[in-house]
UniProtKB/Swiss-Prot annotation:
One of its GO terms (molecular function) is 2-C-methyl-D-erythritol 2,4-cyclodiphosphate synthase activity. PANTHER family: 2-C-METHYL-D-ERYTHRITOL 2,4-CYCLODIPHOSPHATE SYNTHASE, CHLOROPLASTIC. Gene3D superfamilies: 2-C-methyl-D-erythritol 2,4-cyclodiphosphate synthase. Pfam families: YgbB (PF02542). GO terms for biological process: terpenoid biosynthetic process. This is Uncharacterized protein MG459.
Length: 169
């Protein structure tokens, strides 16, 4: 049995939301009434710190390298097809397609730092359901802790994953 651990981290600047048309994704869930949005001058167009941190951790644990490079075949910037609304939910599902044949996900531990004004507890079940669906795992596999960040203009996510190599027949 081969077990491997991966660590993923994402940090983005956020700003107060002024228009309702702006999307704020966390864990594949659109926080419709969010007080914040990602500051796109300092982040990718498809920003979702939870998904990107978990994807980075999975790529690291399975020794597949940097997810941005794998998704884009060597391009240095993220270039998704379609709009952020269509692509944000696909990050983990696309990651799963790279690892599913050789790896089983045993555990995902997520630590999210977000300003207290943004309530996450009401969305936890939806975040868990999304991650479980995208990665085809049980809710018992995931843990999510929410803390207040040191800088109220940032959102940080740290993800640690444990994967096990599947036996090949």
């Amino acid at each position: 049995m081969q077990l491997r651990v991966g660590l993923g981290s994402k940090k983005y600047h956020i700003k107060l939301r002024k228009e309702s048309k702006n999307k704020f994704w966390l864990g594949g869930v659109d926080f419709e009434n969010s007080k914040y949005i990602y500051d796109l001058e300092n982040s990718d167009e498809v920003s979702d710190v939870i998904q990107l941190a978990v994807a980075d951790a999975l790529f690291g644990a399975t020794a597949l390298g940097d997810g941005h490079i794998v998704f884009n075949k060597g391009k240095s910037t993220v270039q998704f097809k379609g709009t952020a609304k269509k692509e944000a939910p696909r990050v983990l599902a696309r990651t799963y397609n790279f690892i599913r044949k050789n790896w089983i996900i045993n555990n995902i531990d997520i630590s999210l730092e977000i300003p207290q004004e943004q309530k996450v507890d009401d969305y936890k079940h939806a975040i868990f359901a999304f991650i479980c669906s995208a990665l085809r795992i049980s809710e018992l596999t995931i843990n999510l802790k929410v803390r207040k960040p040191l800088d109220s203009n940032e959102i940080n996510c740290l993800a640690v994953v444990l994967v096990e190599r599947q036996k090949t027949k």
